[in-house]
Swiss-Prot record:
<keyword id="KW-0012">Acyltransferase</keyword>
<dbReference type="InterPro" id="IPR045229">
    <property type="entry name" value="TPP_enz"/>
</dbReference>
<dbReference type="Pfam" id="PF00205">
    <property type="entry name" value="TPP_enzyme_M"/>
</dbReference>
<comment type="function">
    <text>Catalyzes the degradation of sulfoacetaldehyde into sulfite and acetyl phosphate. Involved in sulfolactate degradation.</text>
</comment>
<dbReference type="GO" id="GO:0050487">
    <property type="term" value="F:sulfoacetaldehyde acetyltransferase activity"/>
</dbReference>
<dbReference type="GO" id="GO:0003984">
    <property type="term" value="F:acetolactate synthase activity"/>
</dbReference>
<dbReference type="GO" id="GO:0009099">
    <property type="term" value="P:L-valine biosynthetic process"/>
</dbReference>
<dbReference type="GO" id="GO:0000287">
    <property type="term" value="F:magnesium ion binding"/>
</dbReference>
<dbReference type="InterPro" id="IPR029061">
    <property type="entry name" value="THDP-binding"/>
</dbReference>
<dbReference type="InterPro" id="IPR017820">
    <property type="entry name" value="Sulphoacetald_Actrfrase"/>
</dbReference>
<keyword id="KW-0479">Metal-binding</keyword>
<keyword id="KW-0460">Magnesium</keyword>
<dbReference type="GO" id="GO:0019529">
    <property type="term" value="P:taurine catabolic process"/>
</dbReference>
<comment type="similarity">
    <text>Belongs to the TPP enzyme family.</text>
</comment>
<keyword id="KW-0808">Transferase</keyword>
<dbReference type="GO" id="GO:0030976">
    <property type="term" value="F:thiamine pyrophosphate binding"/>
</dbReference>
<dbReference type="Pfam" id="PF02776">
    <property type="entry name" value="TPP_enzyme_N"/>
</dbReference>
Length: 603
């Protein structure tokens, strides 16, 4: 079933190829572009202003792509990334793959070297379609100037349909040509609602379950399905867990909210889902990293019947055995299952289940509030030594508790990849979706700052706060030179400052006998000082009270138009390693001798 909307007049018009391009963007309401200016895109960027499109010129294209990701995730509205052919475009690779695994519909515009010189190894020439083949859900190159609008329309529609980035590749000599074309029609398809037989079986399993658990993934947020899942959970008195890095997939204040699974997530959620006899995995691909053991608990319920709901059939049953697979929109499926439940659904052990949920949540809340420090594995002493070296400094958990005391409930937050941000995974909760912008399963460093800038562009009246470790922040620090200009909105960003690549250092303590290779950062660098040099406000916080006060003031300043970077000085404690499942202690066999090193001979 399909429906049409926003159709242009069905008659040919004479226009330039760049006008056709921009008119198609207008048809789809794409109002924001992120990147760095280049000659190959100037014919279209020249008319952005007339079209109502704002071009946000960042300091590095990779950060620009992550700004686009943050904007679209926070608003639900598509944006685009665009830059100069060749090196400008290849700088987008990490951002595009990040958006792919964040299920973010984005338009990637890649101006190409001119057709007449392609294949000659010319200036800024690279095979851009090949570069992004595994990064996008759909890609197409314009083969003739008269097809400019047709191809662009199709690329945008596929980005929306598959909820992922899609690429249009345009030879630069196709711009500034006059063509006669009809603007294309927009044809949107209704999202699938699931097969009747599968829905009946899912409703039957949930109706008979003694300990049903719902697991909400990104698809719940994208489909606007949180209210529908709340109704279903309340009907069953089923606890609701959230997928890894999707803390905003269910209201934190709801009595059935069990918190996020995965790395440094909610122990309550892990303990509750381990008891499940039926799991409704709603809008999630159940990626393996998100269900790894945590806190020593191998919590995934191996004997439970799994109902997996995803709009992409190829992802159902890919990582976990399922009893029922449903290809459908999370909101539609949740509503239909609710309507199909039996009259006695949820009654089995209802009161006992409610008591277990409340008791488990309460115990975890008390434990989390008392956690001040990180633990060492047997045989290692790094965290003990780190506390002894700086006894007056905050630990990462102390910093997160100080942050929680000042963080507005309505705030949008972004998080970077890394040890200190990951330790904070259990802390933030939200009352609505599109509030938590984590880097996702591609795991890029340098995501936190650009993502929160993009979110603020899309949600100017909402407070935003970004978080990064100091290693990851170093990858995006050059954006401080861009975001202080008058047209850019004010944001607040917190950098956890412990002068180390913490996640890799924890690996070094556990498996490499404290042989720290490439883990130490320069203690002479002041990120707060760099912020000040860029015309922004830079603040250093050394205690919990200072951090709470600094964040509270920064949010007030943000409302008044001032961007603040807070350097939160913390000790060098290290949290749980990311990849305990993938690491093991190496054993020397042949041995390595420095005397075997030879000098290279240069002609």
């Amino acid at each position: 079933m399909l429906f049409r909307a926003s159709q242009p007049e069905d008659k040919p018009m004479k226009m330039t190829t760049e006008e056709a391009f921009v008119k198609t963007l207008q048809m789809h309401g794409i109002q924001h572009a992120f990147g760095i200016i280049g000659s190959a895109m100037m014919p279209i960027s020249d008319i952005f202003g007339k079209a109502g499109i704002t071009f946000w010129d960042c300091a590095h294209e990779g950060s620009g792509g992550m700004m686009a990701d943050g904007y679209t995730r926070a608003t639900g509205k598509m944006s685009m990334m665009i830059a100069q052919n060749g090196p400008g475009i290849t700088n987008f690779v990490t951002a595009v793959k990040t958006a792919y695994w964040n299920h973010t519909p984005l338009l990637l515009v890649t101006p190409q070297a001119a057709n007449k010189t392609m294949g000659q190894g010319g200036f800024q020439e690279v095979e851009q379609m090949a570069a992004f083949k595994d990064m996008v859900c759909y890609q197409e190159e314009v083969r003739d100037p008269t097809r400019m609008a047709e191809v662009l329309n199709r690329v945008i529609l596929n980005a929306k349909r598959y909820s992922a980035p899609a690429q249009i590749n345009v030879p630069r000599d196709y711009f500034t040509q006059v063509i006669d074309i009809e603007l294309p029609k927009i044809v949107d398809f209704e999202r699938p609602s699931g097969g009747e037989e599968a829905l009946d079986e899912a409703a039957k399993l949930l109706s008979e379950a003694k300990f049903p658990v719902i697991l909400n993934g990104a698809g719940v947020i994208l489909a606007g399905a949180i209210p529908a899942t709340a109704e279903l959970a309340e009907r069953l008195d089923a606890p609701v867990c959230c997928g890894y890095q999707h803390n905003d997939a269910f209201p934190g204040s709801h009595p059935l909210h069990a918190g996020p699974l995965g790395y440094n997530g909610s122990k309550a959620g892990m303990e509750l889902i381990s008891k499940a006899d039926v799991v409704l995995a709603l809008g999630t691909r159940l990626n393996p990293f998100s269900t790894l053991p945590g806190y020593g608990i191998d919590y995934w319920p191996k004997d439970a019947k799994i109902i997996q709901v995803d709009v992409k059939p190829e992802r159902i049953g890919l990582t976990k055995p399922v009893a029922v697979g449903i290809v459908g929109d999370a909101k539609k499926v949740a509503k239909t299952i609710l309507a199909k439940l039996s009259d006695t659904a949820g009654d089995a052990d209802r009161e006992e289940r409610k008591a277990t949920i409340a008791k488990t949540k309460s115990a975890w809340a008390q434990e989390l509030s008392s956690m001040d420090h990180e633990q060492d594995d047997p045989g290692t002493t790094w965290n003990e030594r780190a506390r002894g070296a700086k006894p007056d400094w905050m630990s990462p958990r102390m910093a997160w508790r100080a942050i929680q005391a000042a963080l507005p409930k309505e705030a949008i937050i972004s998080s970077d990849i890394g040890n200190n941000c990951a330790i904070g995974n259990a802390y933030p909760s939200f009352e609505e979706g599109r509030k938590y912008l984590a880097p996702g399963l591609f795991g890029p460093c340098g995501y936190g700052l650009p993502a929160v800038v993009g979110a603020k562009i899309g949600c100017p009246d909402t407070p935003v706060v970004g978080f990064s470790g100091d290693g990851a922040f170093g990858i995006a620090v050059n954006e401080l030179t861009a975001i202080g200009r008058g047209e850019w909105p004010a944001v607040t960003h917190v950098v956890f400052r412990n002068y180390q690549w913490g996640a890799e250092k924890r690996n070094s303590t556990l498996w490499f006998d404290d042989n720290f290779v490439g883990t130490e950062l320069d203690e002479q660098v002041s990120y707060a000082g760099i912020a000040k040099a860029c015309g922004l406000k830079g603040v250093v916080a050394r205690t919990m009270d200072e951090l709470t006060d600094a964040l509270d003031q920064a949010i007030k300043d943000q409302k008044a138009g001032t961007t603040t970077l807070i350097e939160a000085m913390i000790n060098q404690e290290l949290g749980e390693p990311f990849r305990r499942d993938a690491m093991k202690k190496p054993v020397a066999v042949a041995g390595i001798d420095p005397a075997d090193m030879r000098e290279q001979q240069v002609d």
